[in-house]
A protein has these predicted regions:
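Short, acidic loop-to-helix structural element flanking the phosphoryl-transfer center
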Residues: 1-28, 34-38
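Asp-based, Mg2+/Mn2+-dependent phosphohydrolase catalytic module
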Residues: 17-20, 33-136
Length: 136
């Protein structure tokens, strides 16, 4: 059962709405299983803001393998090099980077190690900073 205390990170809804209004395709690429992913997305109210929902049990290998990101990029019809992957965990950074995505890191529980700093395109404190990548 999902915890009652599940909270959406700051600016997620606003950022997804911003991207949707700009016609930017979006996907979630998560290490979470499908039923839990769908439950979480519905619970926090962002399911309708995402074009695709990709989870680890839809691919051969989970994060840090690139599979989940490669599948997400394919699902939205984009080459990974044309995609920005927003990640908050080192395994996710590795996964997105190995897929060829431009990785933007938003720190959460685990800081980005020095060994991964060269694979990220940018680091932002929260998702409100993501809009600048689309305004440049």
């Amino acid at each position: 059962m999902v915890s009652e205390g599940l909270e959406l990170k700051p600016f997620v809804k606003e950022t997804l709405a911003f991207l949707k209004n700009r016609g930017v395709k979006t996907a979630v690429a998560t290490a979470t299983g499908e039923s839990r992913m769908r439950q979480y997305l519905d619970m926090v109210g962002i399911s309708d803001l995402l074009d695709e929902k990709i989870c680890t049990n839809m691919v051969k290998d989970g994060k840090p393998a690139p599979d989940v990101y490669l599948y997400a990029c394919e699902a939205i019809g984009k080459d990974p090099s044309d995609c920005i992957a927003v990640e908050d965990a080192p395994n996710g950074v590795l996964s997105a980077s190995r897929a060829g995505c431009n990785v933007v890191f938003v720190p959460d529980l685990t800081p980005l190690g020095d060994d991964l700093k060269d694979v990220v395109f940018g680091e932002i404190s929260d998702l409100s900073g993501l809009q600048r990548f689309f305004d440049e």
